[in-house]
Amino acid sequence: MKGIIYPRKSSADAYVYLSPGVREHLFSLLVKYTSSQRDSPAGSSTKVAPDTPQTNFIVEIQWVCHKILLEMEEQFGSLGGLVADINICLIWTLFRNYKHKHRMNNSDTGKSCAEYAQSVVKHLTERMVYCTDKFFINSACSGVTVPQNLALVIASISQVCRNKCQGAWRRMGNGRRTLIDLGLQLVNTYNLLNACGAIDDKCKAFIKLTFPYLNLETVYSPVHAASTGLHQKMAISLYKGQEKRKVPNATIYSNLVTQEKFALPEILLGEITDEGLLANKGPDLEKLLSEPQTILKLVTKLSPVSQFQVFMARWGDKLPSHLKDVCVSDSSQLPQQYENFKVVWPQHQTWPNDETSALPIASASLLSLQAENLPTSVQNSVAQETTGLPPQVPAGEMPPRGNCPVEDHGLLNSDAPDDLSGKGDYDLFTSDDLLPMSSGNVAIPVCEDPLAPPCKKQRMEPPDPLSTPGDNQWGDGAASAWIQSYMENEDAYLELILQGLYHLDEPPKLEDSIQVQDVSNSTNDPLEGPSRSQASCFEDTENIANPLDLFV
């Protein structure tokens, strides 16, 4: 075994609070990875060690990373996203340090891992630089009180990652022990301060928003493609930039140290493309943090359990038999109807964790705005602006082609049908499964006719609370009670909803039916989320000037 460097147990087993089972599994994968790189005998094209199929090896590594995400969420809660990034970066640093390019052609087990290890480490390092930088800028602008000891540890992590970004990429494998020590110090400091009550709920909610969980599909998709011979043109990157670029010599930064200056990493100057990171809507997040308990109960489509569900459905058959039976919890099981039905689900939402209780609800009324309490003129005005139909259109009749309205099923009447599934080609969505204390449903038309002109969402301008009776299209007066209540109580959640990042873990239980779409004969992959026509009604929501325009 001349020339082969095998990992040492003491160094390869060092991570930030991983369970013994996960550490043992990682060490066995690393040994298999290095063993597959042994030289072939002279004059022979056969490999010394039998190889594991490359795809199965990558799937097993991804399975371990999913287990890490689940452990970090269970142990550290809001801080789990940052600790998970550190641990996954440590794993790929080992793959990068133990690879041998001139021997990889003799191996099928870890060839694609060796090719992409450098890119993955760079991606995770830049991700930590971006998130830690946003942490300090947004906390100061949002009125978040961060304990000094916790801020010092996060600043040290940011400094280590910045130094890696400014140096040559061939040095990305350095500093693993330093990152481990800082990760342990981060967890110990956070737990100690939390036990003393020094970290309030607002700070925890802010940490959760700033350090989201990594989307493992972003990292492993190009690795899977490389294992099948489909190399992607561009490596894994966190921002839009040149594919190949010469790294400046470190000497150009030497004079900055004496002047107490520093160079900004390139990641802070480019446009971020990584999924899940909080969009840069400005540094002031005080509105979002007005109800921190609500944010702490929110989950993302990138939550560990949601990612684990999709992973097991897609790659479960590639796992060894002793891993297929491992279940994280009862909530990690996919719904039974997942194989044949795809729920009409917004573009940025996660798949449900259980069967019918968390499925999106199709409301039986276009106006859950307490319509029975509104004047008749207001009901007619809202109906016409929302559906694009005159108030007196008989049930079942459709207006001329091209208007793309929502079908009128007599929903404004007391005898409105309770089941809307399968009626027409127009999908109805509700905001009750998205917003707490919601007072209104969303009904946005979806244009399914290929011959019709582009579908435009029709919106109403919200009334001015200070206006006098008769000043606006709402009929008999100023803003109704429901719109005033919405503006006072739910403004803090609007930005989250518009960005499409979060939804309630336990949506309100309504008595309406569930709208599902049979895709058993469809060519769409049920794991890829809703089709383009279904998701089109939620596009461009981030560009809405007034958030209230989304609900009309």
Curated annotation (Swiss-Prot):
* Gene Ontology biological-process annotations: regulation of DNA-templated transcription
Q: Does the keyword DNA-binding apply?
A: yes
Q: Where in the cell?
A: Host nucleus
**Can you quote a single GO CC term?**
host cell nucleus
Q: Which keywords does UniProt give here?
A: Activator, DNA-binding, Early protein, Host nucleus, Transcription, Transcription regulation
What's one Pfam family the UniProt record gives for this protein?
Herpes_TAF50
Give the main location: host cell
A molecular function annotated in GO for this UniProt entry is: DNA binding
Question: What family is this protein classified in?
Answer: Belongs to the herpesviridae TAF50 family.
Stated role: Transcription activation.
What is the official name of this protein in its record?
Answer: Putative transcription activator BRLF1 homolog
